[in-house]
C-alpha cells in the first residue's frame, strides 16, 4: 500500500518465472498520485522482445540486462530521468554522474549499444508467439502436465509448466538428449 512516505515503487515488467506482463500503465497512474514517489521498471525480461504497453517518459528509472538480449554477461543499463538524484554506492571521482567512481568500461558500453541496436532490429515476437501456441496446444493434451503461464497478458518467450510426477532435473536432461533446452528454475 502506498502512502505519502513512499518514495519508490519497483516493478518487473515481465515476470521471469511465469511470464506475466504487468500493467505498467496502471502502476504509472497509481504512482502519479504520490508526488514523492518514483517508479522503477525492471525491463530485463521484456526489453526488445515485447512492445511496451507504456511510455518511457512516464517512468523515472529502468534497468536492462544485456545477457538477456544476447549481450555480455555482467553488463547492464540503469536509465533514469535527469531530475532523479541517485547516491553513489562507492566513494571516489565524479565520473558517471557521480554514481560510480572510475572510468566507464568503454568496451562494455559499445557492446551494449550494439546489442540493443541488433536486438531492436531482430524482433522475433510473431515467430516466438507461434511456437508458444504450438507448445501450449501439444502440452495441454498430455495428462499430468500443467501450464502455469497465463495465456493472456504473458510473454510468449516464457512458458512455465509443472509435471508433478517426475523429477524436473531428470526431465531437463532427457530433453537435452533431444537438443531441447529448458530451465528448471531461475537464477534471478
Please report, for each region that a protein language model flagged, where it lies by residue:
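Pyridoxal 5′-phosphate
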Residues: 1-188
